[in-house]
């Protein structure tokens, strides 16, 4: 007698991403990558000590994924997050805005307990 096993697959679309991008942010990232002329570039998002609230966000382009990095693919672009920054960025949203204060990436972070007035630093 032959038996069959039923396997339950998890719908990956139902798992919330580590970080989310707005369409504005994804479009700007794609535009910057196109300007650089390298399709291998990914946006590295990180947290460092500093700023008036204790931690600050940083952005840089990187072609290499380091050991322990988490890679997030959304809306046609890729983000890299190092293991230390991951705990501070999980669940955050990256937007891109242009206003009176200039153009900038803005992070809406549910892990931040306080943020400074300019939004570039936070405490957790």
Curated annotation (Swiss-Prot):
Iron-sulfur cluster binds at residues 52, 116, 118. Its cofactor is iron-sulfur cluster. SUPFAM superfamilies: HesB-like domain. Keywords: Iron, Iron-sulfur, Metal-binding. Binds 1 iron-sulfur cluster per subunit. The keyword Ligase does not apply. It holds the Pfam family Fe-S_biosyn. InterPro entries: FeS_biogenesis, FeS_cluster_insertion, FeS_cluster_insertion_CS, FeS_cluster_insertion_RrpA, HesB-like_dom_sf. The keyword Cytoplasm does not apply. GO terms for molecular function: 2 iron, 2 sulfur cluster binding; 4 iron, 4 sulfur cluster binding; iron ion binding. Homodimer. Required for insertion of 4Fe-4S clusters for at least IspG. Belongs to the HesB/IscA family. This is Iron-sulfur cluster insertion protein ErpA. The lineage of its organism: Bacteria, Pseudomonadati, Pseudomonadota, Acidithiobacillia, Acidithiobacillales. The gene is erpA.
